C-alpha cells in the first residue's frame, strides 16, 4: 500500500517519466494551474527554484515562459505560503489576503509610509510601470540608499501585498510594477470568496496536486475558522465518495483521491534531480511520513554544521527519494560541479541508478547553461560500491 501511495503522490505532482503536461509555454501554464502555485526563490547556486520546479515537469521548458505568461495575464505573482507564481484564474482567492493587509492585520506588511505610497501610485498612474530603482533620483542622492532598503522598498511591498500594484514582469529577478487594474485580464472574477469557497479552493488544490494527505498536511499553516471550515469540506468529500480514508500502520489516517486509487500505477518514474523548494518536498512532514526521507535544506545552516552540503538537491529514483546531491553551476566556464553525493541504503540496482544519474546530470547541466559536468565525486562513490 505504501508503494502505491508514493506513486499516487508522485503522479499527482506530475513527476512521472512521461510528463502529463504539454511542451513549452502551454505546458508551463498547465503545470502551474495543476500544482496551484510555484514558489519563487532567489538562490542561484544552480538555476532558481521556480525554473527548476517547472523544468522537472514540463518538456522543452524555457526560462522565458514565466515572464511571457505574466505578460499574457495567464499567471500572476503573489503570496501562497511564500512568494509564488499563481494561476490568474485563481486571482480572486488572493483577495482575502490583500484585504487583510489593507486593514493592517498583517504582522509583516503594515509599515508602509502612506505619503510615499500615494506618491508612488500617482507616478505609476501618470508614467506607467516602474521599478524600485526608478524612484526620484533626488531622493536617492539626498537620502543615500533609503529607497532600496528602507521606506521605498516597504512602500512598494505594502502596495503590492494589499493589491494596489502587481508585478507585470521581471528583468532577471528585478521586479517591474504596474497598477493592478492594468495587469488583470478583462472580465476576471473579482468577487471576494466566502470562507467556505476559500476552504474548498485550498482543499481542491491539495487533492489535485498531491492525491494523498493527512489532516495535518491539509491544514498546514491554516488557523481558526478556516481550519474548521476545511474540516467541513473534508467530511463532505468523504461522504460524496471523492476521498477515501485509509488507516496507516503507524496509526495515521491518510485521505486519498478515490480516482487515483483506481488508476494504473505501473508508471516508470526514472530519475530526477529536484529543487529543495519543489512542491512535492516543501512540506517536510509529508516526506517523513510517506517517503521516510528526512530532508533539510542546509544553506541556512552554519558551514561547520552542514552534513550534506550548502544546496543539496533531493534525488528521486523510481518512486523513492534515494539521495542528495550538492551541485554548483560555474556559469562563466560553463561547468556544473558535483560537490557531494550522499545516497540512502534503499537504492536498488545501483548500476542502473548511476546510468540514470549520469543522463540526468547532463540534462541538468544544459538546463544550467553548462556544457560540461565535473562528476569526479560521483565516479569516486560509484567505484566504492
Residue ranges and their predicted role:
Residues 1-385:
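Long, charged, low-complexity, helical-prone intrinsically disordered regions
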Amino acid at each position: 500500500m505504501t508503494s502505491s501511495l508514493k506513486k499516487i503522490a508522485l503522479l499527482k505532482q506530475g513527476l512521472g517519466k512521461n510528463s502529463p503536461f504539454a511542451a513549452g509555454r502551454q505546458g508551463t501554464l498547465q503545470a502551474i494551474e495543476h500544482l496551484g502555485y510555484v514558489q519563487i526563490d532567489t538562490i542561484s547556486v544552480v538555476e532558481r527554484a521556480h525554473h527548476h520546479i517547472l523544468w522537472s515537469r514540463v518538456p522543452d521548458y524555457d526560462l522565458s515562459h514565466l515572464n511571457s505568461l505574466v505578460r499574457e495575464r495567464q499567471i500572476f505573482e503573489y503570496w501562497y505560503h511564500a512568494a509564488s507564481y499563481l494561476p490568474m484564474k485563481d486571482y480572486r482567492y488572493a483577495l482575502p489576503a490583500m484585504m487583510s493587509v489593507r486593514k493592517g492585520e498583517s504582522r509583516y506588511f503594515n509599515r508602509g509610509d502612506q505619503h510615499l505610497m500615494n506618491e508612488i501610485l500617482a507616478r505609476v498612474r501618470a508614467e506607467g510601470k516602474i521599478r524600485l530603482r526608478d524612484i526620484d533620483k533626488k531622493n536617492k542622492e539626498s537620502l543615500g540608499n533609503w529607497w532600496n532598503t528602507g521606506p521605498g522598498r516597504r512602500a512598494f511591498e505594502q502596495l503590492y501585498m494589499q493589491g494596489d500594484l502587481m508585478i507585470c514582469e521581471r528583468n532577471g529577478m528585478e521586479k517591474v510594477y504596474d497598477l493592478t487594474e492594468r495587469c488583470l485580464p478583462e472580465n476576471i472574477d473579482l468577487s471576494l470568496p466566502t470562507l467556505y469557497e476559500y476552504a474548498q479552493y485550498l482543499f481542491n488544490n491539495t487533492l489535485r496536486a498531491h492525491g494523498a494527505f493527512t489532516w495535518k498536511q491539509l491544514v498546514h499553516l491554516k488557523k481558526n475558522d478556516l481550519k474548521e471550515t476545511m474540516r467541513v469540506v473534508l467530511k463532505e468529500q468523504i461522504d460524496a465518495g471523492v476521498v477515501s480514508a485509509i488507516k496507516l500502520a503507524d496509526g495515521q489516517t491518510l485521505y486519498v483521491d478515490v480516482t487515483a486509487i483506481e488508476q494504473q500505477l505501473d508508471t516508470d518514474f526514472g530519475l530526477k534531480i529536484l529543487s529543495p523548494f519543489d512542491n512535492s518536498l516543501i512540506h517536510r512532514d509529508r516526506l517523513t511520513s510517506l517517503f521516510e526521507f528526512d530532508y533539510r535544506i542546509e544553506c541556512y545552516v552554519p558551514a561547520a554544521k552542514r552534513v550534506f552540503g550548502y544546496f543539496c538537491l533531493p534525488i528521486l529514483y523510481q518512486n523513492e527519494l534515494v539521495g542528495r546531491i550538492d551541485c554548483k553551476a560555474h556559469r562563466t566556464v560553463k561547468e556544473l560541479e558535483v560537490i557531494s553525493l550522499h545516497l540512502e541504503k534503499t537504492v536498488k540496482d545501483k548500476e542502473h541508478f548511476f546510468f540514470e544519474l549520469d543522463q540526468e546530470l547532463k540534462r541538468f547541466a544544459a538546463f544550467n547553461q553548462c556544457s560540461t559536468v565535473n562528476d569526479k565525486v560521483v565516479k569516486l562513490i560509484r567505484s566504492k560500491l
